[in-house]
């Protein structure tokens, strides 16, 4: 065998050459002139043994700023949360880890039940009637929700708050361009959606209004007030929500939301360079047949035993491609499983306690910044993120913090020139008092 991982012997090679009627491998390249063929050896490193290779790769990995050694205050949609140890154990089981879309559900009962549990827990958190098996991430879930609204209402205008994550808005723009839809962004005031601006844009051509709760700045939107404005014009009300926050906040479904979407990353899914994540999509029974992605339902077999099936499949592209409710194919089943296991391990009380710790630690950090002389820009209620006016370029501050073992907050000036020198600080349950104090003191020293 020429290579330990490539099962080809000299006899195999000889047989293959004889089969195609050539004597040597060089004859395969006879059409290529000698003058342009490469001669000599490639200037690459020699092969290493497995221990040598592991040592070299470990050295390269140590150059990364990992969250085991650095205290992270970076959020903006991707958060450093606690994941119960059991999550990785369940995910690593081969029947889950290698499973693909269960097109033959009768032999995939374990996979289907895991997805069904995910759907159930998402419904409980959001206060909605039905949830799908998952979406790619929060951004694509938001865009798919807007497409559903446009198709249902047969209207072409989508209103989205500028307090919605800028990357989600960018995904929405991409989707809307292909569907020839108009996207109008509503400005924010004091860190939340400007209701006067929203009211002025509302008319009978609006398909939906999209807000985030908590929003991109961590602020809590007034969903009850927004819902009245939206439904007066018979538009759909879409809310993007951090599912962890719903452990303590009133769910959007209680405020009359038609569709609730978001990213399940806070539950058991690591940051890992920003992805992959797991979007969720929940809605009311009225839109059950228009929801994108796969739906798992519970039923009974001919013997009266409980079973799980893929239901309402006529909506999907593998049944009727031209009339499918969306063209999402593989869902994020493995990450949805991670979220399910994390939520199950935490339980209702655990999710609530985790959310409360995010609030209390973020409030402590806010007070420390104010005592140090920093201005916390928005004064409304918030979940686990808030905006600090740094008076200096955020990139410079973050570069200095990184040398101290701290990953600083998000530079809001990247997306909004009005917020240059403003940092979005995220504080999760994993941050300690000592880490928060160190962050504030180091930033105070940089001022």
Curated annotation (Swiss-Prot):
GO molecular-function terms, A-Z: glycine dehydrogenase (decarboxylating) activity
Catalytic activity, as annotated: N(6)-[(R)-lipoyl]-L-lysyl-[glycine-cleavage complex H protein] + glycine + H(+) = N(6)-[(R)-S(8)-aminomethyldihydrolipoyl]-L-lysyl-[glycine-cleavage complex H protein] + CO2
EC number, as in UniProt: 1.4.4.2
Keywords associated with the record: Oxidoreductase
A Pfam family matched in the record: GDC-P
One of the GO biological process terms: nucleoside metabolic process
InterPro entries, per the entry: GcvPA, GDC-P_N, GDC_P, PyrdxlP-dep_Trfase, PyrdxlP-dep_Trfase_major, PyrdxlP-dep_Trfase_small
Family under the similarity heading: Belongs to the GcvP family. N-terminal subunit subfamily.
Quaternary context: The glycine cleavage system is composed of four proteins: P, T, L and H. In this organism, the P 'protein' is a heterodimer of two subunits.
Protein task: The glycine cleavage system catalyzes the degradation of glycine. The P protein binds the alpha-amino group of glycine through its pyridoxal phosphate cofactor; CO(2) is released and the remaining methylamine moiety is then transferred to the lipoamide cofactor of the H protein.
Protein name according to UniProt: Probable glycine dehydrogenase (decarboxylating) subunit 1
Gene that encodes the chain: gcvPA
């Amino acid at each position: 065998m020429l290579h330990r991982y490539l099962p080809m012997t000299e006899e195999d090679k000889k047989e293959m050459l004889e089969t195609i009627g050539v004597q040597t491998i060089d004859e395969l390249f006879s059409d290529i002139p000698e003058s342009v063929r490469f001669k000599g050896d490639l200037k690459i490193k020699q092969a290493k043994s497995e221990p040598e290779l592991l040592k070299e790769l470990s050295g390269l990995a140590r150059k990364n700023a990992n969250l085991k050694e650095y205290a992270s205050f970076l959020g903006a949609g991707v958060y450093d949360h606690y994941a119960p140890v059991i999550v990785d154990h369940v995910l690593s089981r081969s029947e889950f880890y290698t499973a693909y879309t269960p097109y033959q559900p009768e032999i995939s009962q374990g996979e289907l039940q895991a997805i069904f549990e995910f759907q159930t827990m998402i419904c409980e958190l959001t206060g909605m009637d039905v949830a799908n098996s998952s979406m790619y991430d929060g951004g694509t879930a938001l865009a798919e929700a807007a497409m559903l609204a446009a198709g249902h209402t047969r209207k072409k205008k989508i209103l989205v708050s500028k307090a919605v994550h800028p990357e989600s808005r960018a995904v929405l723009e991409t989707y809307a361009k292909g569907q020839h839809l108009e996207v109008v962004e509503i400005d924010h005031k004091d860190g939340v959606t400007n209701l006067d601006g929203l009211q002025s844009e509302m008319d009978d051509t609006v398909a939906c209004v999209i807000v985030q709760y908590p929003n991109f700045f961590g602020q809590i939107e007034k969903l009850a007030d927004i819902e009245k404005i939206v439904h007066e014009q018979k538009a759909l009300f879409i809310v993007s929500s951090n599912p962890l926050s719903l452990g303590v906040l009133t769910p959007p479904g209680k405020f009359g939301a038609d569709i609730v979407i978001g990213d399940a990353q806070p539950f058991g899914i690591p940051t890992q360079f920003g992805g992959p994540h797991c979007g969720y999509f929940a809605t009311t029974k009225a839109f059950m047949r228009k929801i994108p992605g796969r739906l798992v339902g519970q039923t009974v077999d001919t013997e009266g035993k409980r079973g799980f099936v893929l239901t309402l499949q006529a909506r999907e592209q593998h049944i009727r491609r031209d009339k499918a409710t969306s063209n999402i194919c593989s869902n994020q089943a493995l990450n949805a499983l991670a979220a399910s296991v994390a939520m199950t391990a935490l339980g209702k009380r655990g999710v609530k306690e985790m959310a409360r710790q995010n609030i209390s630690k973020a409030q402590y950090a806010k007070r420390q910044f104010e005592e140090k002389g920093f201005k916390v820009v928005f004064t409304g209620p918030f979940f686990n993120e808030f905006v600090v006016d740094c008076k200096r370029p955020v990139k410079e501050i973050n570069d200095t913090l990184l040398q101290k073992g701290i990953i600083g907050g998000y530079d809001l000036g990247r997306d909004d020139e009005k917020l240059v020198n403003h940092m979005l600080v995220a504080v999760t349950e994993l941050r300690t008092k000592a880490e928060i104090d160190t962050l504030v003191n180091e930033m105070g020293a940089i001022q």
